[in-house]
Amino acid sequence: MFLKASCSLLTLVLLGTAIAFADQPKAARSVASRLTTEELARWIDERFAEAWQESKIVSPEVVDDATFMRRTFLDLTGSIPSVSEARDFLEYSSEQRRGALVDRLLNDPRRPEKYAERTAAHWATLWRRMMVPGNSPEAQMAVGLDPWLKEQFTANVPYDELVRKLVTAKNDGQALAVVNPRLGVRNGGPTLFFQAVGGKPETAASSVSRVFLGVRIGCAECHDHPFAAWKQKDFWGMAAFFAGVKNGGIDDSSAAKIRPENGLIDYTAVFLGGEEAKIANGKTSRETLADWMVSENNPLFAATVVNRVWQHLIGRGMTDSVDDLDKASPAERRILDDLAKKFVEAGFDLRWLIAGICKSQLYQRECLVLNDTVTEPPPGLRPIKTLSPEQVFDSLEKALSLPVARADGSARFNGLRDQLISRMNEAASNNPEEFRAGIPQALLLMNGRLTTEATDLDQSRTLRGVLDAPFLDTEAKLLTLYLATFSRPPRAEEKQFLLEHIRKQVDGDKQQQAYAEIFWGLLNSPEFVLEK
């Protein structure tokens, strides 16, 4: 049973401001044929129930409330819940509390700065890392895209409009705005995308095709693709749309012809699939490409974004590789293509898609543990995921009650955030189901500052607040440390063992040190950096 804390200044500082959960009113349909998010969730469950029955797959059990809460906070906001957020949800008795949590995190009109903006910032980071992956100087430059992407996600700009803005971005002649003076990161808006991917027609064509159409044509730059249907003429036909992208800058001319360096042939702009582009008067070649890309009839565009969102939320895409959609079999794409059609009918509404997936029973089922006999989950079954570098640090902020770092470089802990993320990026994988030992090792490397201070009785905000709270007994203190780190109560065996350990300490100082050791162990446990 959860202890109800009395109202005090310490309680508010330690546990944060509470969430007031309530049944959420259903939003009016903005598109006549779109499903509600609850209807979409049921549709997803029905389709996968049929697929699993055909494959004789036994559905995993639905997870408990604590696991769902932690999973949803991590997937939508990029960090674990605070202690107060965890208590509020776990003590909320409505049968609709899971759906209410999803709606609250995606769009709380009463307090957008608390949830919707956090969610938008997290998805901006996800999208930027997807568009410009890795830890190269170019990828670091792309951090300047985050403020612009956050604006798009905060406003819930339809995805087709967002991509159109990126593909048709124009130089506005204004100076770049500084985002992080210490790192020299600048905000160039959507034009920065082309600079970050190399600033040349061929790099732009390769990146746009992979990111937004789910196909990799880069291997066809110099020769026909050895494992796919793409020919060299397909690659340069796409590159011709970006003939005005040179040396990191953008020329808004309607140029639609290109000759490779040291080449003998001019290539004109051709859509993937072989149809020659006709550039209308008054339009640039990139505007013509954007019209084709975001068309409701394009079989790759909507399916690619649905597959990417699915990979983030479930842990793996509906196809083997989200960047090789063209290689997927019709059987693999059956549910994906049908879901993509519904996404189009919903007006390319990303918030609608995310909510529908998170409200489904499929999203709420237990992870499948991989072993020697099960090397990869069947479609729709989620693996255990590792947290991204940003998720690890932002979760540490929550667990340790640190001042929240900000992208403008003004917060005390931004240097530590950058250092931790940089180290973890060296060990992290773009595939969220791949766990690497480098992540807990990176945490250990940071013990000199973060986790050591966090478990120091004189410096730790969370630990000091728990130990000094007069209204928390031994059991409640242990519970609070678990909520702060694992977002769940201790299991019966954990509780029994740790309470016995605490109560064995003969004096107050040793008992306080026992709490510090427990907190250190929780922070450095693999469970802290895994999403189950």
Residue ranges, per PLM feature:
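Short, structured secondary-structure elements
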Residues: 27-269, 301-340, 350, 354-467, ...
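Boundary at the C-terminal end of the N-terminal hydrophobic targeting segment
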Residues: 20-22
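Structured secondary-structure scaffolds
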Residues: 279-284, 288-301, 305-313
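Positively charged n-region of N-terminal signal peptides that target proteins for export
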Residues: 1-5
